[in-house]
Amino acid sequence: MSELSFMEKLLDGAEVEWKALEEVCDFKNGFAFKSSLFKESGLPIVRITNVDGKNINLSDVKYFDPSDYRENTASYKVCKGDILIAMSGATTGKIGFYSHENPAYLNQRVGKFLPKLETLNNRYLYHYLLSKVEKIYVIAGGGAQPNLSSSALMEKIKIPVPFPDNPAKSLEIQAEIVRILDTFTELTAELTAELSLRKKQYNHYRDQLLSFEEGEVEWKKLDEVSKKISSGGTPRTGISEYYDGSIPWLRTQEIDFREIWDTGVKITEAGLKNSSAKWIPENCVIVAMYGATVGKVGINKISMATNQACANIDLDDRVVNYRYVFHYLTSEYEYIKSLGTGSQTNINAQIVKSLKVPIPYANDPEKSLAEQARIVTILDKFDTLTTSISEGLPREIELRQKQYEYYRDLLLSFPKSEKRGSLI
């Protein structure tokens, strides 16, 4: 069946009315729980950081004790099936579906949608809101400090209601659209769960393969097994001649335990010459020294330049396999991160140079490299399965997500006009 005939059969001459959210839905703002009264146990609080764009993630949750407050917090309860939205900060506009059995409570700057169920299917609203995240962000003002007003949100976002004069028929159509879209989200959820399991397996085998008894290996500093360890630089911003060139220029936010085949920013020859940025060869192991990604590692698969926050390790292939070092430093992420100093917990080039790696059979380079290669072969299989965007589970998840978004936009793209009109 073609896409058009499918839509025609599903909608079958339906009329649609675009209604402001405030017409078909109520909204509840969160309560101002005091961070000074947060507990490590008690009743959970949903904060903006728990809204991940699809679900409510309670892996990092704070708690409260109701006896600490004079106010009655019962009306701020979040139950299974509730739809929440982040109202400010980096997650502004992100939607989260609460799927947990036990209730939680709504913190300030998190809002809860309360659809009028005689008119609007809860999951229909959820899928529609997922398609409007960018528009909601614009309503919030965008920029560095977005801040979403609940009144503006409820007034400016309009949702299509098919058969508005026939609630039963309308809900039937909405339920069918939900059934189709939920099929795709369930497939993605299954793949994501599989990916999580495979990552745990990778971590287990990595830790087993890279754990050595005393005397089995020789521990050497990175600067002992490298040709060169360098950092880069940043061409002066505001000088247009330095940017939008052809030289890949890596920033630390692009380092995430995987191969790096391209960069988000390119610089020019002039930018390279007039800064501390410099070319590095392919297959360096790169460690992020500053910022949110400090301690993360990656491998550049093309020659590129980097900023000054990258420690670029050009390893001596007569002594070590670069992917062996990559896997080992990945396993040491938490330790490397703990070496940071200052409010930003940064590390420096000297810390990176002094990091030690275990070299098996250090007195027999040929045997040592063979053992490293054996370990790498095993770990690379798991790494490909869990991180590759061209194959493996991440690729499959990406394809399923694109498929979901395609059908979501197809099913929810009703013709829009000022007046109610026929869809066919």
Where in the sequence are the language-model features?
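Charged, alpha-helix-forming regions
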Residues: 1-424
